[in-house]
């Protein structure tokens, strides 16, 4: 799951467009702007940078585990005290590095947990939000990975202990001809008396190559004890992670509460979309009103500047003057009025 979140938010950081574009299906919809969401994106960028750092440390732990397993298989073929000692030093170093890395990863995970708690106080990032669920899921996934890695180290520790126990049992049978009981084996391994016992038995029976055999056994015993000690510390880290994972897992598996939170966020998103739609309609209405008012103002200004009614009055006066001038001239083609005709007849 954390890989899925990592890929999705890596795409978010690269600047690809978000699938949530418009409120409505149209291309002229209102784009949702959420400052809190942008802040959450920045916080998630830093969060996933820390997650990638932890993943690199976990990969190094896995590599060390594989190296230790290979060295352990190699130790089964060695029968020289010096070679066993060199291999023991190498394994001790690898176990020490693994222990340091495990503790470092644990500290980083605790820091991420505190960062998640602080992030819940930001607007839009409270408990149950998408940002909080993402952070919690990814962090819990890292804890599980660390727990799996520590579990593999624990299995290696148990394998080394059981095989060393079988080695002591075989050597005891070789010297005495009897199979030791569990109590005797525990005493020989825990107290280190197996080396002294075998040395004494071999010397008494006059077996050859006593010193090399004893030195080899001593080196194997010291290697097992040192490695087991460090691996037990790793096992303690494993137990701590198991408790945290169990606690976080109980929260993540609470399906009912998550469904309730998700439904509340859906209702809130629906309300926000409806509010944005109302704002969109109001914006369009007031835009149309403003355009109409602007057209009226422009029309009034143009009419006030041009004054077309003054030009129309001047043209009418000129026409009347022309009619007067025409009336002063005699018109031979017009017949005289009846009174004038009667005067002419007289």
Swiss-Prot record:
<dbReference type="GO" id="GO:0031348">
    <property type="term" value="P:negative regulation of defense response"/>
</dbReference>
<keyword id="KW-0007">Acetylation</keyword>
<feature type="compositionally biased region" description="Gly residues">
    <location>
        <begin position="314"/>
        <end position="326"/>
    </location>
</feature>
<dbReference type="GO" id="GO:0050832">
    <property type="term" value="P:defense response to fungus"/>
</dbReference>
<dbReference type="GO" id="GO:0005802">
    <property type="term" value="C:trans-Golgi network"/>
</dbReference>
<feature type="region of interest" description="Disordered">
    <location>
        <begin position="1"/>
        <end position="41"/>
    </location>
</feature>
<feature type="coiled-coil region">
    <location>
        <begin position="41"/>
        <end position="76"/>
    </location>
</feature>
<feature type="region of interest" description="Disordered">
    <location>
        <begin position="314"/>
        <end position="346"/>
    </location>
</feature>
<dbReference type="GO" id="GO:0006952">
    <property type="term" value="P:defense response"/>
</dbReference>
<dbReference type="GO" id="GO:0072660">
    <property type="term" value="P:maintenance of protein location in plasma membrane"/>
</dbReference>
<feature type="modified residue" description="N-acetylmethionine">
    <location>
        <position position="1"/>
    </location>
</feature>
<keyword id="KW-1133">Transmembrane helix</keyword>
<dbReference type="GO" id="GO:0010119">
    <property type="term" value="P:regulation of stomatal movement"/>
</dbReference>
<dbReference type="GO" id="GO:0016192">
    <property type="term" value="P:vesicle-mediated transport"/>
</dbReference>
<dbReference type="GO" id="GO:0043495">
    <property type="term" value="F:protein-membrane adaptor activity"/>
</dbReference>
<dbReference type="GO" id="GO:0031201">
    <property type="term" value="C:SNARE complex"/>
</dbReference>
<keyword id="KW-0812">Transmembrane</keyword>
<dbReference type="GO" id="GO:0009504">
    <property type="term" value="C:cell plate"/>
</dbReference>
<dbReference type="GO" id="GO:0072659">
    <property type="term" value="P:protein localization to plasma membrane"/>
</dbReference>
<dbReference type="InterPro" id="IPR006011">
    <property type="entry name" value="Syntaxin_N"/>
</dbReference>
<dbReference type="GO" id="GO:0009737">
    <property type="term" value="P:response to abscisic acid"/>
</dbReference>
<dbReference type="Pfam" id="PF05739">
    <property type="entry name" value="SNARE"/>
</dbReference>
<dbReference type="InterPro" id="IPR006012">
    <property type="entry name" value="Syntaxin/epimorphin_CS"/>
</dbReference>
<dbReference type="Pfam" id="PF00804">
    <property type="entry name" value="Syntaxin"/>
</dbReference>
<dbReference type="InterPro" id="IPR000727">
    <property type="entry name" value="T_SNARE_dom"/>
</dbReference>
<dbReference type="InterPro" id="IPR045242">
    <property type="entry name" value="Syntaxin"/>
</dbReference>
<dbReference type="GO" id="GO:0006886">
    <property type="term" value="P:intracellular protein transport"/>
</dbReference>
<dbReference type="GO" id="GO:0005886">
    <property type="term" value="C:plasma membrane"/>
</dbReference>
<dbReference type="GO" id="GO:0006612">
    <property type="term" value="P:protein targeting to membrane"/>
</dbReference>
<feature type="domain" description="t-SNARE coiled-coil homology">
    <location>
        <begin position="214"/>
        <end position="276"/>
    </location>
</feature>
<keyword id="KW-0333">Golgi apparatus</keyword>
<feature type="compositionally biased region" description="Low complexity">
    <location>
        <begin position="1"/>
        <end position="12"/>
    </location>
</feature>
<dbReference type="InterPro" id="IPR010989">
    <property type="entry name" value="SNARE"/>
</dbReference>
<dbReference type="GO" id="GO:0009620">
    <property type="term" value="P:response to fungus"/>
</dbReference>
<feature type="topological domain" description="Vesicular">
    <location>
        <begin position="307"/>
        <end position="346"/>
    </location>
</feature>
<dbReference type="GO" id="GO:0010148">
    <property type="term" value="P:transpiration"/>
</dbReference>
<dbReference type="GO" id="GO:0009506">
    <property type="term" value="C:plasmodesma"/>
</dbReference>
<dbReference type="GO" id="GO:0005484">
    <property type="term" value="F:SNAP receptor activity"/>
</dbReference>
<keyword id="KW-0472">Membrane</keyword>
<feature type="topological domain" description="Cytoplasmic">
    <location>
        <begin position="1"/>
        <end position="285"/>
    </location>
</feature>
<keyword id="KW-0653">Protein transport</keyword>
<dbReference type="GO" id="GO:0005829">
    <property type="term" value="C:cytosol"/>
</dbReference>
């Amino acid at each position: 799951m954390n890989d899925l979140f990592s890929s999705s938010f890596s795409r978010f950081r690269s600047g690809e467009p978000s699938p949530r574009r418009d409120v409505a299906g149209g291309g002229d919809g209102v784009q949702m702007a959420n400052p809190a969401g942008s802040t959450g994106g920045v916080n998630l960028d830093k969060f996933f940078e820390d997650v990638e750092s932890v993943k690199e440390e976990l990969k190094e732990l896995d590599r060390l585990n594989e190296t230790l397993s290979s060295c352990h298989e190699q130790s089964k073929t060695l029968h020289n005290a010096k070679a066993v000692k060199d291999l023991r030093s190498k394994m001790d170093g690898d176990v020490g590095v693994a222990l340091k890395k495990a503790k470092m990863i644990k500290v980083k995970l605790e820091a991420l947990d505190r960062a998640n708690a602080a992030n819940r106080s930001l607007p839009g990032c409270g408990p149950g939000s998408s940002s909080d669920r993402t952070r919690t899921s990814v962090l819990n996934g890292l804890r599980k990975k660390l727990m799996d890695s520590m579990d593999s180290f624990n299995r290696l520790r148990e394998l080394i202990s059981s095989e060393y126990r079988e080695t002591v049992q075989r050597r005891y049978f070789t010297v005495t001809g009897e199979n030791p009981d569990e109590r005797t084996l525990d005493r020989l391994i825990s107290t280190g008396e197996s080396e002294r016992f075998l040395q004494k038995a071999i010397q008494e029976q006059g077996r050859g190559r006593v010193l090399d055999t004893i030195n080899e056994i001593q080196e194997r015993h010291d290697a097992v004890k040192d490695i087991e000690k460090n691996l037990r510390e790793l096992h303690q880290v494993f137990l701590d992670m198991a408790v945290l994972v169990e606690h976080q897992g109980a929260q993540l598996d609470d399906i009912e509460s998550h469904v309730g939170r998700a439904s509340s966020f859906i209702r809130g998103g629906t309300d926000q979309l409806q509010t944005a739609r109302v704002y969109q309609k109001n914006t369009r209405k007031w835009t149309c009103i403003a355009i109409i008012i602007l057209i009226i103002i422009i029309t009034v200004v143009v009419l006030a500047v041009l004054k077309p009614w003054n030009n129309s009055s001047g043209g009418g006066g000129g026409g009347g003057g022309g009619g007067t001038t025409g009336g002063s001239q005699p018109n031979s083609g017009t017949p005289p009025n009846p009174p004038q005709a009667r005067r002419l007849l007289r």
